Amino acid sequence: MEVASAVAEPDACSLDHYLSLPDHSMDERIAAARARLGASTVLLGHHYQRDEVVRFADFTGDSYKLSKIAAETEAKYVVFCGVHFMAESADVLGRSEQHVILPDLNAGCSMADMAEISQVEACWETLLGAGLGAEQVMPLTYMNSTAAIKAFCGERGGLVCTSSNARKAFEWAFARAEKILFLPDQHLGRNTAFAMGIGLDEMVVFDPWQIGGGVPAEKLRAAKVILWKGHCSVHQRFLPEHVDRVRAKYEGIRVVVHPECRWEVCQKADALGSTERIIAEVEEAPEGTMFAIGTEIHLVNRLAKRFAPLGKKIITLDDTGCLCTTMYRISPQHLAWALENLLEGRVVNQIKVTDEVKHWARVALDRMLEIRG
């Protein structure tokens, strides 16, 4: 009777082999591989990446900053420690001979997944069927969307935005059309429009899972902003009572949140802005300032550690901690695997957008980069 069988050791170049190794054994290997690759490779790290990964990045930033770097870099290989839509955008903006690598292909984005191209196309037909002319509505998508959604917007005269330039994108769109269809984050769209003086009663939420988006045709025709029913799973967890709680507990605390948070949370905050803006808020504050920050926990913890010696105390707005699990998927093992394969001449996990989609997605992204000012 067979009571045991041999288990084959994973190939030394396989991802399974790397995943079987401890974190601490990756540091020297990543550093050595990075050094050997030199200027041929650039490592981009989003602010929400775990510390063990982001410390190896050549550049860190929000999605806007990293998209600009991706468009400008001369490196042949772009290793993007972020999520899938970011790597897609880097491929769209990069040169044809560049290779964009996402260390873990499972690093996706739940918000981006909330707007499928077939749903957006059906929404557009619903708007036209409600009596709106194509020239009346400007499709505008948040960076946190697939390349196909970006291409959809680009082909119809629209553009992409990030949380750091959303207002400029809205102004650009309203200079050319009466209405905006904003994809896929309802909260960023609502907060941006409201800050521009557009009332909540001038916005509607289009639910792709309901017939006609769940909005009567007359309300679609009356709305200035049509918001897609999508959200960030991390930022939606922050609630108005979290703001009330920290204010009651810490006198004089400054509450700063990301505009992907609910409108009710943003209205109670002292300031809201992109991750780059949040960092600047902390940098510019005087010694002794205390912050409660409503964004992903890795960035909050990193800021707390960085500014503690400068007399600034930073806590998360929700003390249960809000982790972006898809960002967290990229581990030191994934990064080491991708880099060491490059040393052997193997490009793994390359993100490649089709030429047709790339053309119109680039149009939309270029419009975003041009309006930054």
UniProtKB/Swiss-Prot annotation:
Molecular-function annotations in GO: 4 iron, 4 sulfur cluster binding; metal ion binding; quinolinate synthetase A activity
Main localization, broad class: cytoplasm
Free-text comment on the cofactor: Binds 1 [4Fe-4S] cluster per subunit.
Enzyme class: transferase
GO biological processes: 'de novo' NAD biosynthetic process from L-aspartate
Keyword presence, Metal-binding: yes
GO CC term (a single one): cytosol
Domain of life: Bacteria
SS bond list: none
Catalyzed chemical reaction(s): iminosuccinate + dihydroxyacetone phosphate = quinolinate + phosphate + 2 H2O + H(+)
Enzyme Commission number(s) from the entry: 2.5.1.72
Pathway this chain belongs to: Cofactor biosynthesis; NAD(+) biosynthesis; quinolinate from iminoaspartate: step 1/1
Entry keyword set: 4Fe-4S, Cytoplasm, Iron, Iron-sulfur, Metal-binding, Pyridine nucleotide biosynthesis, Transferase
Entry cofactors: [4Fe-4S] cluster
Amino acids binding [4Fe-4S] cluster: C109, C232, C324
InterPro entries: NadA, NadA_sf, Quinolinate_synth_A_type3
Family note: Belongs to the quinolinate synthase family. Type 3 subfamily.
Record's function text: Catalyzes the condensation of iminoaspartate with dihydroxyacetone phosphate to form quinolinate.
Protein name as catalogued: Quinolinate synthase
Organism name: Acidobacterium capsulatum (strain ATCC 51196 / DSM 11244 / BCRC 80197 / JCM 7670 / NBRC 15755 / NCIMB 13165 / 161)
